[in-house]
Regions:
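Bacterial N-terminal signal peptides
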Residues: 5-15
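Small/polar, glycine/serine/threonine/aspartate-rich low-complexity segments that form flexible
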Residues: 22-26, 72-105, 223-234, 263, ...
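Periplasmic alpha-helical coiled-coil/stalk elements that build and connect Gram-negative outer-membrane
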Residues: 132-244, 342-345, 349, 369-372, ...
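Bacterial Sec-pathway N-terminal export signals of envelope proteins
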Residues: 20-72, 80, 103-105, 118, ...
């Protein structure tokens, strides 16, 4: 038994430790990522509560324009019944059942408040649309960051592969007595730098995964499954995109709401009328007090003098309108600038991408020629290392340029109000 236990301990001691399995990262297509972000992101849900709140305010404003019905019950006990020989005028115990029905028949101020509350729902809805666009743009930019990180890893892996191949060649030459330790150390240094750069690129990818997962309200990192295609319109009509941008639509709604408030200012001092119906039942009835009675009342109210309050309130509302119009003008200027800059950026980055791709091809050719020349003794490894760095930098430039083109196209669609669909 002891021999068996000892053998088991030896087997467990020499058995290799089970390596942890890598966690599978969920990959999501671009359109699906945008849809999930708009459905599940807490920021969108929080913005949507403003619509529900505006609707609740509308219901509250409408409530004061509808009939109100109240009921009352009261019991009265006197020290003794009151009356004379002809009968009792007030019984000692008496119960009164009453009711009140009131209805505003003329309420311009209340009606105006209801209209304002209805306009506020439109403002809240458009403001929520603007928040949805902001979340969608943040998701798209993070998605592009994931793609860029993947490209950068490919560049670093290719550069590290070249550096390790050169290091292997330098070591073989040194071992064969044909190379120098200096060349081997230079090649080793370049390989170590490549390993560090690859490690940094992989960490950047991990950070992008986590950021995308947060935006999609996922409990874990999310990867990109493919590259999005941003279709840029061939022609741009300002009259069209101005009606598509959520920020302009929301600000226009704010201006209209403020203008309505100013137009309705006179209703604050307009006459108001209210009708009320008050039935009553008393038991037991007194001699001079019938058991069933009712009263119908119509009251009319007209403010005559408010000490200048209405004039001040109207002026304040006019200032709010002016501020909203100024804000709208500023947004329109900014929007036109964003469209112009986005169009210029797309054209410029397209040209830059073509240039850096050509430069990358030439850098790869230079690296191939330099490596071959070094192997036949025509150059030193300094030229090889320099060519490797140039090829790596050219690959990085291509990755950045491709990302810049995609971001410029996204910015143009956002500026035109065409993203998200």
């Amino acid at each position: 038994m002891r021999e068996f236990v000892g053998a088991l301990i030896v087997v467990l001691a020499i058995a290799p430790e089970a390596s942890p399995q890598p966690v599978a990262i969920r990959a999501i297509a671009f359109d699906e990522a945008i849809r999930l972000a708009l459905e599940r992101n807490p920021t969108v849900a929080q913005a949507a509560t403003s619509i529900a709140r505006a609707d609740a305010i509308l219901q509250r404003a409408r409530a004061v324009t509808l009939p109100n019905i109240n009921a009352q019950v009261s019991s009265t006990t006197l020290d003794a019944a009151q009356g004379f020989e002809a009968g009792i005028t007030r019984p000692r115990n008496q119960v009164t059942f009453g009711g009140t029905v009131t209805m505003p028949v003329l309420a311009p101020a209340r009606w105006a408040a209801t209209a304002r509350a209805r306009a506020d729902i439109e403002v809240a809805t458009l403001s929520t649309t603007e928040v949805r666009q902001q979340v969608a743009v943040a998701t798209a930019q993070t998605y592009l960051a994931v793609i860029r990180a993947h490209r950068q890893i490919e560049v670093e892996e290719r550069a590290l592969e070249n550096a390790r191949a050169h290091l292997d060649y330098a070591q073989r030459r040194l071992e064969g007595g044909l190379g120098s330790r200096l060349n081997m150390l230079r090649a080793s240094q370049e390989a170590m730098v490549g390993e560090a750069r690859l490690e940094n690129a992989e960490l950047a990818l991990r950070q992008s995964w986590e950021a995308l997962g947060v935006l999609l309200a996922e409990d874990g990192p999310v990867d990109a499954a493919g590259e999005p295609a941003f279709a840029v319109p061939a022609s741009i009509d300002e009259a069209s995109w101005a009606l598509s941008r959520p920020d302009l639509l929301a600000q226009n709604a704010i201006v209209r709401s403020a203008e309505r408030v100013v137009r309705d200012s006179w209703k604050d001092v307009a006459p108001s009328a209210e009708a009320s119906f008050d039935p009553q039942y008393v038991t037991p009835a007194g001699l001079f007090q019938p058991s069933r009675t009712w009263r119908f009342t119509v009251s009319l109210t007209q403010p005559l003098y408010l000490g200048g309050l209405q004039r001040a309130v109207t002026r304040e509302r006019e200032i709010v309108v002016d501020a909203a119009r100024f804000a709208l003008t500023g947004l329109e200027i900014q929007a036109r600038s964003e469209v112009r800059l986005a169009r210029a950026s797309v054209t410029s980055f397209d040209r830059s991408l073509a240039s850096v791709r050509a430069a990358e091809a030439r850098a790869a050719e230079v690296l191939s020629i330099t490596t071959t020349s070094f192997e036949v003794g025509a150059t030193t490894n300094i030229e090889v290392i320099d060519a490797q760095r140039s090829a790596r930098d050219a690959g990085t430039a291509v990755a950045l340029a491709e990302d810049a083109v995609q971001r410029a196209r996204l910015d143009l669609l956002v500026a035109l109000g065409e993203f998200p669909q």
